[in-house]
């Protein structure tokens, strides 16, 4: 039976206005829209009155709901029948954890009530198209129609393909019907294999073969033999990449054989809880570094949010599934798309060349895709610290003559670093009889054929197959699985995981054969033991679907009880679906039909399938010299600053959490004005050291339209000039990931790919001492479509993205582009040796040209000398600022440095040659460094020692004020206000934020950037930052216990425990499942802290599901009530813990006036480094800090204080219960965005009880208790930041 329950409004006023404006633009007479959430409960038994009231209360969340009788025609948008949304999975979990076992499943839709004039059927179709994503949702016209969401179907049996009867044609038909993308020789191979076996193949076997042997999984092109211009080549592409490892194996612990590569890290204190006692402590050991970079291009072109989200999720799983289990740590992301053409902000170079119907626009990708990737990282709890964004779409005269080149098939890059224990780097042995386990969520009928689909050029496969290959994301489930993996590796030698892989393309059909084969075993499996939420799925759908957030593991049979215990505690679903066999054979039994859908020797599936040979021709690039008529420097500057590749990226940065883990030493945002221009990302290796890890990206794809090899060399060079900004030491410490994107088969591209791989793998990297131990390729970067009567295709440039990773000696020695205006000198190190080529630059692009001669690595020895010289200067503390020269050239380098320093520039380019345009806009490799004027001679001497004397040019100095002036020989070349340039640079971000978020907030942020008087972040402390008020109490040796409370989806508990640990507490890991099961109580604890994250993925309101699982469970409710009423206790709730505790008002004495916390005014997750003021309040944790103003990490989507009315707000303030407020950089309490990131009235962001014993706050003090984890800080701070005082106050209070 199905119950229908109304929910809160689904759209804010500005979202409704945006929709109405879209309808008006489409000439649809829609006058009014009202939208609200509707919940559907599928029940297995009726609810009594109390249970019904409980369910209603559970589904009451979000902003307060005014009573409303909807008017107009109903359009009900729900998930597609036959799919289960992540919302449903998490909401159903909450219902069960609150004791509502009669609920089979909860699902949610949005009911749109449309008031409109007379609309034709076609116009109604336009309206429904605007309201839903056809890839993931459907539209019903009555609430009762939602019954279809819960329809159960009978299982369907396996189907066989009549090869023996119909011969080869049967395979050809199956290839088309199932979208297998099999090549002719593979069809021959299968015909031969099954004829020898004397039986017909089943559909599931063919599907499994196609996935396991797709280009996506097998990398056939990279392993192929090559004939170029009739000449046999000595090496495959992959062999040339491996050459870098053979030449420089130093510091690499694992390459080419696992889900990620591993290099040596530092010996540090890894901080985690003991399995037996739950007590957190430091464990001194090597934290080796793993690295991986993936792409998820095809799904992102079809449906950007889930495409990018599952791209990030899959890469995170690769890291976790390295060795015998590892810990993902920090992420990077990248996008290459065609021109944005932002409505009302179209740029002169952006022509509309059309696109295929089935893929979305570049604007849609950049609106939704980054949100999907960020949302996954945020909810999983991994900071996203690095990225790139390029737009390119033009008709150019390249290798194949004049043709369309651009990114209709986008690049969506997802990568990152993690840490792994030394004894877990290598996979273990799989013994015969080992249990084969799937860890993670249930099988769902989604993402079928992603491996094969992404191996085709967009436009080749059937639209329905595209539809089937889109995946869904549930990061909170992946977090639970990762917690299990963490518990396993933390056991050291007792780790129950022998072998682990993630489930990605091809689902279990790819992952399980790979697992057993890599372990030297076969496997026998039971289909019906696989967890599944959809009983009507066929064997093929159960075995081959790409449901995300799953891992496959081999666990020794005697370790299964331990593994089961860990999974139950973390609430991570798992199933034992088979066991390892001696015989190298794969069998899958189906209990329901009592048959064998799969019965194959492993070598048929993974054996010597036909090897590819590429017989290709070289084409010479045409190109045309840059036509300069009509190009003025002033016009060029504005255009280049508007090019998205160059322009400010704030709209891509602030949506992503950059402080979670408490180990982020350098995020994208630089300095007191928080400008996104960092050279590289840096994390600390642990919560107790200054060792660390760095990541940086290099990418120059348009250059490949003129010179394939130069483009690849520049990508390596740029990654190097970016990562050089931190203290690494020997260049051999740097390891690269190479991600290759190409349109294989397009004239000239294959030979170009070979040339580019050779340039990097055989020549440049070995000469520099660099290794590429990991990478990925995507070989179908082309789209085809019909535009009117014309057949069109858009081919991407050959694109190499290099991600550089390194161990860092001291994270405090990371240099940013932030300029200082004291006596200084700016030096350009020009590795282009004065060539100043303008081919394939930003300048050429904004004037719709390609040019003819591009930049290149002019001298490998000088590039190496450059890196060594910068490292020497970093170690000697001689650099005040550093920024590499890249897209936009020297002009953009200087401008970004001036933005970060909020200062003027007085530059002189007289020594850079007579061609001023080329001097300013050439993108040759190099960097601008700022040094003290007194150090200039010594610095130039270091540069000369490294062979760079002829590359160094004095180009002026940074000055206070707002003028940005470039001269040569006394003549002004360019002069403008820095503020004007800053505004131009910000306009792309502003327009994207206006489109995507609340336009009022976007306008306020843009306006703030034009305020030259803004003093930036600043600090005013009312206490001595170096005083440790807890020291006398720590000296007694007594360590009171703090319960570090987490629920499924919480992700900030480790850094919270570390902050309390430093203040003299014993921090104990307490999971809600421990309390609910009665394994742990709160009676032994002095302090309770509820941590940040996304409990239940924030469904049913942020923190509300967590709170209700306490309130609706009598024993646990009593446990909390008793704790809060005990006089000697303290409690702290941060972020998600704050939201949760604000819903426990009925249990917490003196909290009656507390507000609720709801959706931010911007309607967006906000990650900011915000200034707050400590106000006079009873809070015991903030004693002695009143009047202080200091920055703090903020990361939330629902942090806006909601009060009942003005009287409620007045009472809250008059009682003095407000503990922290947001202030602007002038120290004034503010409601203006983004200084107030959520729009809370009067800047309120923390409240306390009348006794001051319980304090809840939205910002994160635990993420910035160490100075080094602050995005910016005054130089005189020591090891501890000012927020450490909160934790020491707690220790002082307990005496």
UniProtKB/Swiss-Prot annotation:
Protein's organism: Escherichia coli O6:H1 (strain CFT073 / ATCC 700928 / UPEC)
Lineage, uppermost ranks: Bacteria, Pseudomonadati, Pseudomonadota, Gammaproteobacteria, Enterobacterales
Pfam hit, one: GATase_5
Record: residues binding Mg(2+): 718, 722, 884
Keyword Nucleotidyltransferase belongs to the record: no
Protein keywords: ATP-binding, Cytoplasm, Glutamine amidotransferase, Ligase, Magnesium, Metal-binding, Nucleotide-binding, Purine biosynthesis
Descriptive protein name: Phosphoribosylformylglycinamidine synthase
SMART domains with a match to the protein in the record: GATase_5 (SM01211)
Reactions catalysed: N(2)-formyl-N(1)-(5-phospho-beta-D-ribosyl)glycinamide + L-glutamine + ATP + H2O = 2-formamido-N(1)-(5-O-phospho-beta-D-ribosyl)acetamidine + L-glutamate + ADP + phosphate + H(+)
Residues where ATP binds: 307-318, 678, 886
Catalytic residues in the record: 1135 (nucleophile), 1260, 1262
One cellular component term from this protein's GO annotations in UniProt: cytoplasm
Pathway(s) the chain acts in: Purine metabolism; IMP biosynthesis via de novo pathway; 5-amino-1-(5-phospho-D-ribosyl)imidazole from N(2)-formyl-N(1)-(5-phospho-D-ribosyl)glycinamide: step 1/2
Gene Ontology terms: biological process: 'de novo' IMP biosynthetic process
Subunit relationships: Monomer.
PROSITE patterns reported for this sequence: GATASE_TYPE_1
Function: Phosphoribosylformylglycinamidine synthase involved in the purines biosynthetic pathway. Catalyzes the ATP-dependent conversion of formylglycinamide ribonucleotide (FGAR) and glutamine to yield formylglycinamidine ribonucleotide (FGAM) and glutamate.
Span list, region Disordered: 305-327
HAMAP family for this protein: PurL_1 (MF_00419)
Keyword Ribonucleoprotein: no
Recorded family membership: In the N-terminal section; belongs to the FGAMS family.
EC number: 6.3.5.3
């Amino acid at each position: 039976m199905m119950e229908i329950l109304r929910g809160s409004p689904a759209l804010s006023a500005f979202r409704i206005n945006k929709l109405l404006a879209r309808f008006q633009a489409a000439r649809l007479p829609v006058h009014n829209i009202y939208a609200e959430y509707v919940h559907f409960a599928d029940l297995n038994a009726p609810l009594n009155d109390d249970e019904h009231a409980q369910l209603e209360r559970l589904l009451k969340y979000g902003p307060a709901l005014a009573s409303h009788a909807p008017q107009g025609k109903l359009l009900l948008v729900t998930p597609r029948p036959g799919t289960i949304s992540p919302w449903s999975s998490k909401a159903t979990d909450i219902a069960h954890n609150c004791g509502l076992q009669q609920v089979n499943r909860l699902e949610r839709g949005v009911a749109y009530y449309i008031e409109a004039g007379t609309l034709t059927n076609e116009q109604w179709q336009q309206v429904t198209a605007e309201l839903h994503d056809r890839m993931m949702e459907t539209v019903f016209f009555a609430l009762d129609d939602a019954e279809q969401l819960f329809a159960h179907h009978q299982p369907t049996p396996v189907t066989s393909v009549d090869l023996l009867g119909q011969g080869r044609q049967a395979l050809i038909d199956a290839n088309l019907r199932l979208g297998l993308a099999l090549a002719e020789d593979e069809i021959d191979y299968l015909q031969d294999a099954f004829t020898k076996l004397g039986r017909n193949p089943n559909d599931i076997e063919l599907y499994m073969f196609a996935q396991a042997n797709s280009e996506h999984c097998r990398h056939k092109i990279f392993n192929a033999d090559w004939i170029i211009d009739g000449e046999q080549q000595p090496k495959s592409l992959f062999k040339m990449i491996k050459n870098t490892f053979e030449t420089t194996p130093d510091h690499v612990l694992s390459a080419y054989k696992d889900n990620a590569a591993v290099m040596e890290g530092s010996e540090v204190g890894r901080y985690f809880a003991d399995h037996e006692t739950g007590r957190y402590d430091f464990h001194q050991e090597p934290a080796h570094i793993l690295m991986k970079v993936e792409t998820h291009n095809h799904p992102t072109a079809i449906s950007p949010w889930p495409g990018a989200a599952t791209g990030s999720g899959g890469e995170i799983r690769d890291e976790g599934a390295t060795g015998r289990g590892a810990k993902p740590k920090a992420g990077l992301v990248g996008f290459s798309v065609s021109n944005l053409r932002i409505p009302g902000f179209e740029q002169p170079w952006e022509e509309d060349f059309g696109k295929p119907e089935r893929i979305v626009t570049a604007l849609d990708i950049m609106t939704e895709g980054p949100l999907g990737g960020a949302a996954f990282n945020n909810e999983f709890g991994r900071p996203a610290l690095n990225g790139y964004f390029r737009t390119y779409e033009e008709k150019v005269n390249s290798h194949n003559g004049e043709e369309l080149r651009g990114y209709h098939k986008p690049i969506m890059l997802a990568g990152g670093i993690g840490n792994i224990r030394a004894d877990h780097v290598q996979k273990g042995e799989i013994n015969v009889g080992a249990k084969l386990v799937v860890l993670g969520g249930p099988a769902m009928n989604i993402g079928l054929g992603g491996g094969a689909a992404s191996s085709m050029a967009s436009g080749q496969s059937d639209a329905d197959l595209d539809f089937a290959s889109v995946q869904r994301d549930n990061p909170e489930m992946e977090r639970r699985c990762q917690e299990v993996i963490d518990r396993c590796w933390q056991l050291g030698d007792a780790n129950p995981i022998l072998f682990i892989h993630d489930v990605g393309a091809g689902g279990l059909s790819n992952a399980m054969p790979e697992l057993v084969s890599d372990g030297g075993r076969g496997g026998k499996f039971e289909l019906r033991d696989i967890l599944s939420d959809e009983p009507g799925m066929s064997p093929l759908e159960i075995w081959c679907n790409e449901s995300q957030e799953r891992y496959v593991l081999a666990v020794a049979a005697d370790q299964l009880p331990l593994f089961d215990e860990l999974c139950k505690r973390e609430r991570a679903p798992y199933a034992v679906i088979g066991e390892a066999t001696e015989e190298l054979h794969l069998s899958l039994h189906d209990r329901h039909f009592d048959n064998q859908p799969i019965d194959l020797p492993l070598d048929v599936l993974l054996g010597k399938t036909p090897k590819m040979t590429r017989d290709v021709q070289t084409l010479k690039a045409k190109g045309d010299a840059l036509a300069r008529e009509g190009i003025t420097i002033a016009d060029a500057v504005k255009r280049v600053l508007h090019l998205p590749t160059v322009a400010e990226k704030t709209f891509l940065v602030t949506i992503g959490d950059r402080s979670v883990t408490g180990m982020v030493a350098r995020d994208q945002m630089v300095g007191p004005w928080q400008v996104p221009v960092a050279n590289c990302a840096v994390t600390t290796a642990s919560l107790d050291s200054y060792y660390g890890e760095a990541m940086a990206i290099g990418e120059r794809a348009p250059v490949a339209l003129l010179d394939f090899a130069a483009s690849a060399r520049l990508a390596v060079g740029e990654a190097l000039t970016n990562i050089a900004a931190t203290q690494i030491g020997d260049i051999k410490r740097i390891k690269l990931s190479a991600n290759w994107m190409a349109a294989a088969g397009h004239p000239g591209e294959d030979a170009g790919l070979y040339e580019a791989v050779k340039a990097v793998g055989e020549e440049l990297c070995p000469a520099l001492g660099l290794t590429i131990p990991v990478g990925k390729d995507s070989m179908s970067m082309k789209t085809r479509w019909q535009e009117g009567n014309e057949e069109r295709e858009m081919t991407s440039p050959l694109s190499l993205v290099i991600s550089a990773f390194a161990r860092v000696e001291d994270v405090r020695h990371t240099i940013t582009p932030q300029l200082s205006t004291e006596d200084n000198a700016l030096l350009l190190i020009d590795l282009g040796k004065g060539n100043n080529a303008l081919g394939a630059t930003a300048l050429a692009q904004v004037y719709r040209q390609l040019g003819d001669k591009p930049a290149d690595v002019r001298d490998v020895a000088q590039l190496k000398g450059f890196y060594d010289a910068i490292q020497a200067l970093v170690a000697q503390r001689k650099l005040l600022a550093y920024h590499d020269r890249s897209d936009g050239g020297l002009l953009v380098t200087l401008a970004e440095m001036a933005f970060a320093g909020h200062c003027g520039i007085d530059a002189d380019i007289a020594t850079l040659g007579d061609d001023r345009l080329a001097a300013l806009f050439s993108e040759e490799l190099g960097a601008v460094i700022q040094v003290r004027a007194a150090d200039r001679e010594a610095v130039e001497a270091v540069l000369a020692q490294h062979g760079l004397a002829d590359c160094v040019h004095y180009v002026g100095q940074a000055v206070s004020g707002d003028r940005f002036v470039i001269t040569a020989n006394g003549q002004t070349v360019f002069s403008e206000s820095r503020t004007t340039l800053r505004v131009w640079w910000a306009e792309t971000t502003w327009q994207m934020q206006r489109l995507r978020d609340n336009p009022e907030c976007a306008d306020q942020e843009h306006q703030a950037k034009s305020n030259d008087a803004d003093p930036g972040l600043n600090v005013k402390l009312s206490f001595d930052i170096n005083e440790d008020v807890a020291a006398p109490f720590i000296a007694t040796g007594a360590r009171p216990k703090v319960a570090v409370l987490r629920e499924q989806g919480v992700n900030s508990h480790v850094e919270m425990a570390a902050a309390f640990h430093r203040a003299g507490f014993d921090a104990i890991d307490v999971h809600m499942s421990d309390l609910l099961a009665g394994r742990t109580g709160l009676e032994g604890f002095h302090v309770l802290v509820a941590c940040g994250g996304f409990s239940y993925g924030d469904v049913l309101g942020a923190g509300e599901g967590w709170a209700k699982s306490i309130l609706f469970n009598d024993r646990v409710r009593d446990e909390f009530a008793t704790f809060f009423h005990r006089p000697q206790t303290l409690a702290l709730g941060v972020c998600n813990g704050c939201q949760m505790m604000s819903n426990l008002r009925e249990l917490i004495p003196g909290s009656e006036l507390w507000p609720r916390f709801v959706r931010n005014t911007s309607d967006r997750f906000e990650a900011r480094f915000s200034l707050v003021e400590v106000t006079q309040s009873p809070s015991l944790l903030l004693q002695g800090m009143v009047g202080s103003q200091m920055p703090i990490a903020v990361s939330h989507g629902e942090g806006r204080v909601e009060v009942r009315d003005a009287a409620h707000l007045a009472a809250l303030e008059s009682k003095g219960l407000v503990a922290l407020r947001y202030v602007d950089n002038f120290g004034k309490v503010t409601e203006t965005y983004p200084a107030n990131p959520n729009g809370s009235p009067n800047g309120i962001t923390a409240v306390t009880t009348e006794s001051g014993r319980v304090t809840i706050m939205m910002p994160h003090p635990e993420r910035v208790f160490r100075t080094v984890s602050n995005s910016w800080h005054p130089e005189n701070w020591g090891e501890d930041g000012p927020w450490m005082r909160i934790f020491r106050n707690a220790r002082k209070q307990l005496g």
